[in-house]
């Protein structure tokens, strides 16, 4: 599951600068921790570049993983499976998570 990409089903209303609308998300939670929720990071094709927003390719389109907006979502919000990060992308997301949480 970790590193998998899913289409997110619509959830509660967003506020402020939170992402809204249809989008994909990357599962970033450890496979060793099974809960009714899953920690994900949404993606965006229009977000500004930042060292904590690694780029990945999804269906031939470059998109950014918004590690700065990672959150727990109920497993029922996971829609269709959309792919899996490759080893390089997984490493870049891991680095961004460590940077965002200050655990480098």
Whereabouts are the PLM-identified features?
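Conserved functional hotspots at enzyme active or ligand-binding sites that engage polyanionic ligands
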Residues: 1-104
């Amino acid at each position: 599951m970790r590193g998998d990409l899913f289409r997110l089903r619509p959830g509660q209303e967003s506020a402020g600068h939170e992402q809204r609308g249809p989008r994909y998300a990357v599962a970033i939670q450890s496979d060793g921790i099974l809960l009714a929720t899953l920690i994900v990071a949404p993606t965006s094709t229009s977000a500004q570049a930042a060292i904590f927003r690694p780029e990945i390719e999804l269906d031939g389109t470059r998109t950014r993983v918004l590690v700065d907006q990672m959150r727990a979502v109920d497993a029922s919000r996971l829609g269709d499976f959309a792919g899996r990060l490759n080893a390089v992308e997984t490493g870049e997301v891991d680095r961004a998570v460590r940077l965002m949480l200050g655990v480098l």
